[in-house]
Amino acid sequence: GINPFDQPDVEASKIETRKLTDEFEQTGKLPAETARITDDGISLFCDDANAAALGLDEATTLSEAIRRHLGRISTGDYFAMLAYINMNSENESALRQIREAVLSRNGNATCLGFGPRFLHSTGQAYKGGANNGVFVQVTCDDAEGVAVPGQKYSFGIVKAAQARGDLDVLFERGRRAIRLHIAGDVREALKRVGNIASGTK
């Protein structure tokens, strides 16, 4: 039978998250990472396999990279946005516009999850299910906020580690995934991504 509490791929994300928070505990910072593209406050991150599949090089613009990534959505695929940003009506509306742009162009199913809450539900399917998802993870510069009792890191650092850890597992599973990190105004950046997705920019 099916054990609804068996979530091996959720545990894999937890393991990667713990590695990152342990690193912060020891060094006072998360491991360094290098963006593939940075443009006007939006940085794109992905592993070597996705970078190669997207044909990224020094001349690739952010718009080109996003369009190429969305162009990987084929018949039978779904598109998922994994948003590690504040869950509010403004952000949800901006993310919905991106989903609607993909839906109107491709006709594929789309879904949205706010992290880290989705990790214990759809997060298992994304990593342990069929490889028919195309993912865009969205993160931003959160205020570090309240410290975790007994630890050197804050809940903001934990959230960042959860996002990076989950993305690492998606990469390990060979998923088509990128991360867009927003350093400035989140709503304006999402609007820009929506324009790119709809082909208006």
Predicted regions and their residues:
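Phosphate-moiety recognition in structured ligand-binding domains
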Residues: G1-K201
